[in-house]
Curated annotation (Swiss-Prot):
Part of the ABC transporter complex XylFGH involved in xylose import. Responsible for energy coupling to the transport system. Its EC number is 7.5.2.10. The complex is composed of two ATP-binding proteins (XylG), two transmembrane proteins (XylH) and a solute-binding protein (XylF). Residues 6-244, 261-506 form the ABC transporter domain. It catalyses: D-xylose(out) + ATP + H2O = D-xylose(in) + ADP + phosphate + H(+). This is Xylose import ATP-binding protein XylG. InterPro entries: AAA+_ATPase (IPR003593), ABC_carbohydrate_import_ATPase (IPR050107), ABC_transporter-like_ATP-bd (IPR003439), ABC_transporter-like_CS (IPR017871), ABC_transptr_XylG (IPR013455), P-loop_NTPase (IPR027417). Belongs to the ABC transporter superfamily. Xylose importer (TC 3.A.1.2.4) family. GO terms for cellular component: plasma membrane. It is a peripheral membrane protein. CDD domains: ABC_Carb_Monos_I, ABC_Carb_Monos_II. It comes from the Bacteria. GO terms for molecular function: ABC-type D-xylose transporter activity; ATP binding; ATP hydrolysis activity.
Length: 511
């Protein structure tokens, strides 16, 4: 019997002659968690698609051994039957089906040729209880539950398939801190029961906490596999990016000028409960060249606030917005962009990209009028602009005409940034600009933010990562329960002070 539950040997994969994977090795023991680390586009997800059968045997080179025997899977059904289950970053849920129906999708219990819903609900409830998940009603549609709860339902679905190896791709990217803790504790329990795990995350503190071994890949090549006990987070970062990063936040001096943008008495109401305010009488000013961070707990109203300023909040709103001292009316994103206000949305996949369109066209769609003459697009001029943006933002793509959905999350995010920078905004709103982005891409995005500030662009940034808010902001607004709880200059500002303001403890305001 092999020492390893899984061995991937010398795995290679090409797309249109471009090597995505080149000689990758990965080994996992039963009861072991292997952290798989690498920058966006390094090949992590491609490797997991090979392992999980998304790319069937014969479409890649190398060998996979499972429980000591070579595995030649022709699809996902084969790998799941063997006990290899992947949980994708984008959850594979059918929102209007019940929790139980999602857990048993494709393997529904039947009686007399009909689905036995009583048996299915009972087995689903029993499964969740076994996983110590006691606050989910299996008869309710999945859309009733938060992203964190849906992640747990996906895990229950995997356990129902008798998973021996669980592949988790960025499982906490959209979870709250408490939901993340529940998930990590659950994975630790699985390890004690002998289940193996491959954990892919850009949150290296999570990797360090639950991984026994770390494998790093870069540009499709295997860089190192080492016990986590021998590594520090800076060690992993250095192996990922190929260079030492002494300062993740490359602060650069920039001048802060006069007030550029002002929001007065902004209030927004919940879409599903029109009597409930989600933003309650918030006012603030933003100066030319200033980076203003917005901090707060998940659900505090930060995204609702910035969405209303860009004209995309679907519920009722009221208040006044001023740009360069003049009141402006913003009812739609078109109004905002015409006034010089652009926004990078929180949900890149849903609101930021057109997935089947090329990378380049996703960048230039905001400024097509620049390349239009008598109703026709000057494709040569557009291509010059696309190539310039790809170089400026270091977007990794084999061809600007590839569908943007084929790019890694970090490179998609850079394309979204480009789309919102091309109109030359006076005010740039960034809602979770580095969510799902690796440490190297984060560094490049931070440098870009500072470069824009030096050019006089006013930046309003929402982030759930406190070190990020404190690392790049000139000033920090704190939102709690829809209200402005603090306005602090970022001078000796601590996470503790920001958190105290967010949860409503006394804090001194300083504009």
């Amino acid at each position: 019997m092999s020492e390893y539950l899984l061995e991937m040997r010398n795995i290679g994969k090409e797309f249109n002659g471009v090597k995505a994977l080149d000689g990758i090795y990965l080994k996992v023991r039963a009861g072991e968690c292997v952290g798989l680390c690498g920058e966006n586009g390094a090949g992590k997800y491609t490797l997991m698609k090979v392992l999980s059968g998304v790319y069937p045997h014969g479409t890649w080179t190398g060998e996979i051994f499972w429980e000591g025997k070579e595995l030649k899977a022709s699809g996902i059904r084969d790998t799941e039957a063997a006990g290899i289950v992947i949980i994708h970053q984008e959850l594979m849920m059918v929102p209007h089906l019940s929790v139980a129906e999602n857990i048993f999708l494709g393997c529904e219990p039947t009686t007399g040729g009909f689905i036995d819903y009583d048996q299915m609900n009972a087995r689903a409830a029993e499964l969740l209880a076994r996983l110590k998940i006691n606050d989910i009603n299996v008869a309710l549609p999945v859309y009733h539950y938060s992203g964190g709860k849906q992640q747990l339902i996906e895990i229950a679905k995997a356990i129902n398939k008798n998973a021996k190896l669980l592949i988790l791709d960025e499982p906490t990217s959209a979870l709250t801190a408490s939901e993340t803790r529940v998930l990590i504790d659950l994975i630790k329990d699985f390890k004690k029961q002998g289940m193996a795990c491959v954990y892919i995350s850009h949150k290296l503190d999570e990797v360090a906490e639950i991984s026994d071994t770390v494998t790093v890949i870069r540009d499709g090549a295997h860089i190192a596999t080492r016990p986590m006990s021998e590594l520090t987070t800076p060690d992993i970062i250095t192996m990922m990016v190929g260079r030492e990063m002494k300062n993740l936040f490359p602060r650069e001096p920039h001048d802060i000028g006069e007030v550029m943008f002002e929001a007065r008495n902004i209030s927004c109401w919940d879409v599903t409960n029109p009597d409930r305010k989600v933003v309650d009488d918030v006012s603030f000013a933003l100066r030319r060249g200033e980076i203003l961070g917005i901090a707060g707990l998940v659900g505090a109203g930060r995204t609702e606030l910035v969405s209303s300023l860009f004209g995309v909040w679907p519920g009722a709103c009221q208040g006044q917005v001023f740009l360069e001292g003049k009141e402006i009316k913003i009812r739609t994103p078109r109004d905002a962009v015409r006034q010089g206000i652009c926004m990078v949305p929180e949900d890149r996949k849903r609101d930021g990209i057109l997935p089947i369109m090329p990378v380049g066209h996703n960048m230039t769609i905001s400024v097509l009028d620049r390349f239009s003459l008598r109703g026709l697009i000057d494709k040569d001029a557009e291509l010059v602009a696309i190539q310039r943006e790809i170089l400026r933002l270091k977007v990794k793509t084999a061809d600007p005409m590839l569908a943007i959905a084929s790019l890694s999350g970090g490179n998609q995010q850079k394309a979204v940034l480009s789309k919102m920078m091309l109109p030359d905004p006076k005010v740039l709103i960034l809602d979770e600009p580095t969510r799902g982005v690796d440490v190297g891409a984060k560094y490049e995005i931070y440098k870009l933010i500072f470069a824009l500030a030096r050019q006089g662009v006013s930046i309003l940034m929402v982030s759930s990562e406190m070190p990020e808010v404190l690392g790049i902001s000139d000033r920090v607004l704190v939102i709690g329960e829809g209200k402005l709880r603090g306005d602090f200059p970022n001078e000796n500002l601590t996470q503790e002070k920001v958190l105290a303001a967010a949860i409503g403890k006394p804090a001194t305001n300083a504009a």
